[in-house]
Amino acid sequence: MPRRREVPKRDVLPDPKFGNVEVAKFMNVLMLDGKKSVAERIVYGAFDQIEKKAGKAPIEVFSVAINNVKPVVEVKSRRVGGANYQVPVEVRPSRRLALAMRWLREAAKKRSEKSMALRLAGELLEASEGRGGAMKKRDEVHRMAEANKAFSHFRF
């Protein structure tokens, strides 16, 4: 692969309903086989459910949930002298957002509600309150980093 220059990041256009870039990115994370309209229907359906259940602004619930799920540190494998160490490293802001969105999607998929919109609404509400599958995943990653703090001097 050529190493001439860094590939520029593409700008994501804000979503049509709320004009929010993070919501548009989340739709792209949810999208399967390029079916954006299906992803939009799921996200907007989940937002309607949030408004019904919680009576709060869905955008606020979404942003609080995303911020709660964002990891601060994670572990990376590093080989030193024939042994692999799990080295805790700080997570870049762009990766934080990407991981949070991915974890929310996966946690929502594993839930038992009927439709994906309902599952997503439930997961976003729980994450905004500091519980749920995505929060469990974040806490697990933080625990791993805490447990391997002794190897933090092997920084990359």
Curated annotation (Swiss-Prot):
Record protein name field: Small ribosomal subunit protein uS7
GO biological process per UniProt: translation
The keyword RNA-binding appears for this protein: yes
Recorded family membership: Belongs to the universal ribosomal protein uS7 family.
Pfam family name, one: Ribosomal_S7
Recorded GO MF terms: rRNA binding; structural constituent of ribosome; tRNA binding
NCBIfam families (alphabetical): rpsG_bact
Species of the source: Cupriavidus necator (strain ATCC 17699 / DSM 428 / KCTC 22496 / NCIMB 10442 / H16 / Stanier 337) (Ralstonia eutropha)
Domain of life of the native organism: Bacteria
Chain's role: One of the primary rRNA binding proteins, it binds directly to 16S rRNA where it nucleates assembly of the head domain of the 30S subunit. Is located at the subunit interface close to the decoding center, probably blocks exit of the E-site tRNA.
GO cellular component: small ribosomal subunit
Keyword vocabulary terms for this entry: Ribonucleoprotein, Ribosomal protein, RNA-binding, rRNA-binding, tRNA-binding
Primary gene name: rpsG
Subunit (UniProt): Part of the 30S ribosomal subunit. Contacts proteins S9 and S11.
